[in-house]
């Protein structure tokens, strides 16, 4: 197990904990992007990165106010020399079917299609062993991390299939290959997310859909606020790392990446340069081998 974990973490030799020059020049002019969990942390950073890359329209989805994110995105776009994007803010709970259906309907009526969907909304839940906390709190993590991604994907796929990029990025966790005690709701839900992503990739590949899972790095956010202080030294990555990484990876359709699990700590140009090796060896898939 330890060998497999090490092989995955070090699959790409060059690694990063912050954004770097090679991924800061993505081009998203003409693209429409939707992001869940966009009000803070990684979601906000992803939105700002797309803004800086000239995205034409951005759909920000969250339960909390998004006015600050909207203004930050527009400022980043203008500062980078682009025309201000159309930024649509949608108040929605991804785990509520009616809420996300109404959100998708609003987006359809306003924009008609999307090119890229980033399922970033997530929940960690109570830190502690299986006896800690309440059962409802434990299950709520699955409601957000699995049901929420399912409902959002289900609602937005028709619009994605009308777009150019037809790409879904689901935010995963390194814990699926390197288990951590006291996260019995969060980590299994992220493992299930990988399989869900793979199934979506299989079901819609003939229609041109690309779907992959990305580990964003260890970024300190509101989600990690319940972690013990002893965990703090592990959170060494900036939100800008996943923000710029996702924008860079999705500027082109990477069909060969569909159904795979990648780390955004990896040097992405180096990762892409190994496409043939990855495809021929069927690498970067989370499977059981006996």
Curated annotation (Swiss-Prot):
Location of the active site: 186 (proton acceptor), 190 (lowers pka of active site tyr)
Disruption phenotype: Impairs the synthesis of anditomin but accumulates andilesin D.
Keyword Acetylation recorded: no
Pathway: Secondary metabolite biosynthesis; terpenoid biosynthesis
GO annotation terms (biological process): terpenoid biosynthetic process
Annotated EC: 1.1.1.-
Gene3D superfamilies assigned: NAD(P)-binding Rossmann-like Domain
Transmembrane feature ranges: none
Annotated keywords: NADP, Oxidoreductase
Recorded GO MF terms: oxidoreductase activity, acting on the CH-OH group of donors, NAD or NADP as acceptor
Record keyword Oxidoreductase present: yes
PANTHER family for the chain: CLAVALDEHYDE DEHYDROGENASE (PTHR42760:SF37), SHORT-CHAIN DEHYDROGENASES/REDUCTASES FAMILY MEMBER (PTHR42760)
Purpose of the protein: Short chain dehydrogenase; part of the gene cluster that mediates the biosynthesis of anditomin, a fungal meroterpenoid. The first step of the pathway is the synthesis of 3,5-dimethylorsellinic acid (DMOA) by the polyketide synthase andM. DMOA is then converted to the phthalide compound 5,7-dihydroxy-4,6-dimethylphthalide (DHDMP) by the cytochrome P450 monooxygenase andK, which is further prenylated by the prenyltransferase andD to yield farnesyl-DHDMP. Further epoxidation by the FAD-dependent monooxygenase andE leads to epoxyfarnesyl-DHDMP.
Protein name, as recorded: Short chain dehydrogenase andI
Species of provenance: Emericella variicolor (Aspergillus stellatus)
Gene that this sequence comes from: andI
């Amino acid at each position: 197990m330890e060998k497999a974990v090490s092989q995955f973490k070090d699959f790409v030799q060059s690694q990063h904990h912050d954004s770097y020059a090679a991924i800061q020049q993505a081009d998203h002019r003409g693209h429409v992007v939707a992001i869940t969990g966009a009000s803070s942390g990684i979601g906000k950073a992803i939105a700002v990165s797309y803004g800086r890359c000239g995205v034409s329209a951005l759909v920000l989805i969250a339960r909390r106010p998004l006015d600050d994110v909207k203004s930050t995105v527009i400022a980043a776009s203008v500062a980078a020399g682009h025309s201000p994007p159309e930024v649509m803010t949608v108040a929605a709970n991804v785990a509520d079917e009616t809420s996300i259906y109404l959100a998708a309907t609003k987006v359809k009526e306003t924009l008609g299609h999307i090119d890229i969907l980033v399922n970033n909304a997530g929940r960690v839940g109570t830190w502690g062993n299986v006896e800690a906390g309440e059962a409802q709190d434990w299950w709520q993590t699955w409601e957000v991390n699995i049901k929420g991604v399912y409902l959002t994907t289900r609602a937005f796929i028709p619009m994605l299939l009308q777009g150019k990029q037809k790409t879904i990025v689901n935010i995963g966790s390194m814990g699926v290959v390197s288990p951590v005690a006291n996260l019995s709701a969060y980590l299994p839900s992220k493992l299930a997310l990988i399989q869900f992503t793979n199934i979506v990739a299989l079901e819609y590949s003939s229609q041109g859909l690309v779907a992959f899972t990305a580990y964003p790095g260890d970024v300190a956010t509101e989600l990690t606020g319940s972690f013990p202080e002893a965990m703090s030294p592990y959170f060494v990555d900036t939100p800008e790392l996943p923000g710029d990484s996702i924008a860079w990876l999705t500027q082109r359709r990477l069909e060969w990446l569909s159904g795979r699990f990648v780390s955004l700590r990896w040097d992405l140009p180096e990762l892409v340069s190994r496409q043939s090796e990855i495809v021929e060896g069927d690498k970067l898939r989370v499977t059981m081998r006996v």
